[in-house]
Swiss-Prot record:
One of its GO terms (biological process) is hydrogen peroxide catabolic process. Its EC number is 1.11.1.6. Heme binds at residue 348. Its cofactor is heme. Keywords: Cytoplasm, Heme, Hydrogen peroxide, Iron, Metal-binding, Oxidoreductase, Peroxidase, Peroxisome. This is Catalase isozyme 1. GO terms for cellular component: cytosol; peroxisomal matrix. InterPro entries: Catalase, Catalase_AS, Catalase_clade1/3, Catalase_core, Catalase_haem_BS, Catalase_immune_responsive, Catalase_sf. The active site is at 65, 138. It is found in: Cytoplasm, Cytosol; Peroxisome matrix. Homotetramer.
Length: 492
């Protein structure tokens, strides 16, 4: 009998209960005891196995993006981009690729309400013929920090106080006062966009700058953007309290119910393209993740559409065990020197190995749907059937060879080894422009949220003065209004 033929699956369920090893269980209601009221016997293997499995049901929670919901569907190319990339799944209009998508909140725990003011994750796994491609982004196009060295710190600042386990504004504004590049992100988080109505009415962004490479080896910087066909809708504070008070899983339920009813969510994928030769023409660094690219100069170009038409079959197997990593790319798509992207490439795969084990890419939801071959073997929870005698490379006894080469970025890097900030920080221009683009009532709501955060009694006069000086440099009127509301005299 082939032990690998019938892998564990509900498709092989028996009509009666069994142990994990397949032995029949004739009583799944009572423990084995000495007499009807006697002590339980240690030899009750089924009881021990049942309890031991129960005790180990929970796996480590994601350090960020713990609260999430997933759905499956397809991505279809609608516009020709073969002049920009040799990626097989983007080779021509009409090509469809199966996908799974996970939406999430970022900071709060696995069971937290989906109505909290928080960025939202928007991660897409493409199961292409050349391997998986993970586009791991958020609903906002920018982030709080530009260098991954600060990533643990920004997460710690937003997470609950380690002493009281309460999320506190003084900790957030204390840390962010040291990273003024965060101001642009705050104009998204404290804006009306800060609480999406649900996942279907939410934009997505790749956030980081990637590269596309065509067959000739020409490289372009690229930004990815998802636009929902049903529009963007958000909740104001009073609406969020009402919705969250009646259903703390409202966004998950909305996604699940919409797909079940045949009302399939859809997003259009757009890209912005920049020639690396032109990167010095801007007053910001195009690889700075705290900046957006101006759409009037670098317009959005349509690529395809994402349709989610199938709910997941099991929440644990296809949401909790679903794992993404920005390092998982395919030929025709690669990385840039974006400092945050460079650190995410390591951190994401490392946290998956911690949560799920070294063989997490063997889990069905994470495994590629195309043929694949390497000598990465053994380790905890390895369930791949292998019968090779050669587990090294190269070998004259094994016909496996290197794959055909494909174009990769080949820019020459030069410079001295140093730890430093980028030359073009320009932290205040874009947040100021964004604030001035809003209607007066929207500006007022943003100001109220800012005042509320900076009114935390543990925020010092010095800290408020720093924040006022920052916002004055973004927009003088905004900074002066903030100073008046906080009863603080501006220092500049």
């Amino acid at each position: 009998m082939d032990p690998y033929r019938n892998r564990p699956s509900s498709g092989f369920n028996t009509p009666f209960w069994t142990t994990n090893s397949g032995a029949p269980v004739w009583n799944n209601n009572s423990s084995l005891t000495v007499g009807s009221r006697g002590p339980i016997l240690l030899e009750d293997y089924h009881l021990i196995e049942k309890l031991a499995n129960f005790d180990r049901e929970r796996i480590p929670e994601r350090v960020v993006h713990a609260r999430g919901a997933s759905a499956k569907g397809f991505f279809e190319v609608t516009h020709d981009v073969s002049h920009l990339t040799c990626a097989d799944f983007l080779r021509a209009p009409g090509v469809q690729t199966p996908v799974i998508v996970r939406f999430s909140t970022v900071i709060h725990e696995r069971g937290s309400p989906e109505t909290l003011r928080d960025p939202r994750g928007f991660a897409v796994k493409f199961y292409t013929r050349e391997g998986n491609f993970d586009l791991v982004g958020n609903n906002f196009p920018v982030f709080f920090i530009r260098d991954g060295m600060k990533f643990p710190d920004v997460v710690h600042a937003f997470k609950p106080n380690p002493k009281s386990h309460l999320q506190e504004n003084w900790r957030i504004f204390d840390f962010l006062s040291h990273v003024p590049e965060s101001l642009h992100m705050l104009t998204f988080l404290l804006d009306d966009l800060g609480i999406p109505q649900d996942y279907r009415h939410m934009e997505g962004s790749g956030v980081n700058t990637y590269t596309l490479i065509n067959k000739a080896g020409k490289v372009h910087y690229v930004k990815f953007h998802w636009k929902p066909t049903c529009g963007v809708k958000c909740l104001l504070e009073n609406e969020a309290i009402k919705v969250g008070g009646s259903n703390h899983s409202h966004a998950t339920q909305d996604l699940y119910d919409s797909i079940s009813a045949g009302n399939y969510p859809e997003w259009k994928l757009y890209i912005q393209i920049m020639d690396p030769a032109h990167e010095d023409k801007f007053d910001f660094d195009p690889l700075d993740v705290t900046k957006t690219w101006p759409e009037d100069i670098l317009p959005l170009q349509p690529v395809g559409r994402l349709v989610l038409n199938k709910n997941i079959d099991n929440f644990f197997a296809e949401n909790e065990q679903l794992a993404f990593c920005p390092g998982i790319v395919v030929p025709g798509v690669s990385y840039s020197e974006d400092k945050l992207l460079q650190t995410r490439i390591f951190s994401y795969s490392d946290t998956q190995r911690h949560r799920l084990g070294p063989n997490y890419l063997q889990l069905p939801v994470n495994a590629p749907k195309c043929a694949h071959h390497n000598n990465h073997h053994e380790g905890f929870m390895n369930f791949m059937h292998r019968d090779e005698e050669v587990n090294y490379f190269p070998s004259r006894c094994d016909p496996a060879r290197n794959a055909e080469s494909f174009p990769v970025p080949s820019a020459i890097c030069s410079g001295k080894r140093e730890k430093c900030v980028i030359e073009k920080e320009n932290n205040f221009k874009q947040p100021g422009e964004r604030y001035r683009s809003w209607a007066p009532d929207r500006q007022e709501r943003f100001l109220n949220r800012l005042v509320g955060g900076l009114s935390d009694p543990r925020i010092t006069h010095e800290l408020r003065t720093i924040w006022i000086s920052y916002w004055i440099q973004c927009d003088k009127s905004l900074g002066q209004k903030l100073a008046t509301r906080l009863n603080v005299k501006p220092s500049i």
